[in-house]
UniProtKB/Swiss-Prot annotation:
This is Leucine-rich repeat-containing protein 38. The gene is LRRC38. The lineage of its organism: Eukaryota, Metazoa, Chordata, Craniata, Vertebrata. GO terms for cellular component: plasma membrane; voltage-gated potassium channel complex. Keywords: Cell membrane, Disulfide bond, Ion channel, Ion transport, Leucine-rich repeat, Membrane, Repeat, Signal, Transmembrane, Transmembrane helix, Transport. Mainly expressed in adrenal gland, thymus and skeletal muscle. It comes from Homo sapiens (Human).
């Protein structure tokens, strides 16, 4: 039985090592610095991926200035105590569904200066306590109307310096606590689709830290850009009479349906009239025969 002793000792040592690895306060990843028991600083290290492992009780993580392309899907499941995440100036291209699962304590999230192009529905669904979200200086061209659902505590949203030409008002209406919104630095297109957003912006101008002057848009069929300060509701008056594709489809379908109903009704009426006309001569002939018999 003695030969088993080294094996048992090795197993015990491995178990102890694993427990130390998973224990709160575990040593920082190589190349990073722990400035306090709950802060990990991995800024400007040229890292190609999120280093691992961190102390499980880390609350503030700084990974700005690296080459990281994705946030692991299970990242917040292991580091659910994270409150502050600085992910600026990386190579992040997309946010996979479920990326923020387990991020219930996250309050500050900076994803600026990355390569994001789209925000899908529920991109931050589990991050319900977020207070500040920065998406500035990305390549965003589209934001789903449900991208910010459940962010009822969000007060600061930065969407400036992207490639947005339009934005659904529904996406902003989902943010009841919003106090500050950056929209400047985008190539907005002042067409009829922009009319609803323009109305929202006018009603919530106090939430724009740089005001209407810094937000510019291009007029349809024109190359020049103008400040929203120069526009008014009257600028979109023609849009009140314009029809969307859905409206046009409904009108066309209704017209076709009415036409078909009219054709069927006309055919039925013509058939009835023809039957009556055929029956009338027979009735007259019967009346003449009765007169002769008399």
């Amino acid at each position: 039985m003695r030969p088993r002793a080294p094996a048992c000792a090795a197993a015990a040592l491995g178990l102890c090592s694993l427990l130390l690895l998973l224990a709160p306060g575990h040593a920082c990843p190589a190349g990073c610095a722990c400035t306090d028991p709950h802060t990990v600083d991995c800024r400007d290290r040229g890292l190609p991926s999120v280093p691992d492992p961190f102390p499980l009780d880390v609350r503030k993580l700084l990974v700005a200035g690296n080459r990281i392309q994705r946030i692991p899907e299970d990242f917040f499941i292991f580091y659910g105590d994270l409150v502050y995440l600085d992910f600026r100036n990386n190579s992040l291209r997309s946010l996979e569904e479920g990326t923020f699962s387990g991020s219930a304590k996250l309050v500050f999230l900076d994803l600026s200066y990355n390569n994001l192009t789209q925000l899908g529905a529920g991109a931050f669904r589990s991050a319900g306590r977020l207070v500040k979200l920065s998406l500035a200086n990305n390549n965003l061209v589209g934001v789903h109307e449900d991208a910010f659902e459940t962010l009822e505590s969000l007060q600061v949203l930065e969407l400036n310096d992207n490639n947005l030409r339009s934005l659904s008002v529904a996406a902003l209406a989902a943010l009841p606590a919003l106090r500050s919104l950056r929209l400047d630095g985008n190539p907005w297109l002042c067409d009829c689709d922009f009319a609803h957003l323009f109305s929202w912006i006018q009603e919530n101008a106090s939430k724009l830290p740089k005001g209407l002057d810094e937000i510019q848009c291009s007029l349809p069929m024109e190359s020049r850009r103008i400040s929203l300060r120069e526009l008014s509701e009257a600028s979109f008056s023609e849009c009140r009479f314009s029809l969307s594709l859905t409206d046009l489809c409904i009108i066309i379908f209704s017209g076709v349906a009415v036409s078909i109903a009219a054709i069927i009704s006309s055919f039925f009426l013509a058939t009835v009239v023809q039957c009556l006309q055929r029956c009338a001569p027979n009735k007259d002939a019967e009346d003449e025969d009765e007169d002769k018999d008399d």
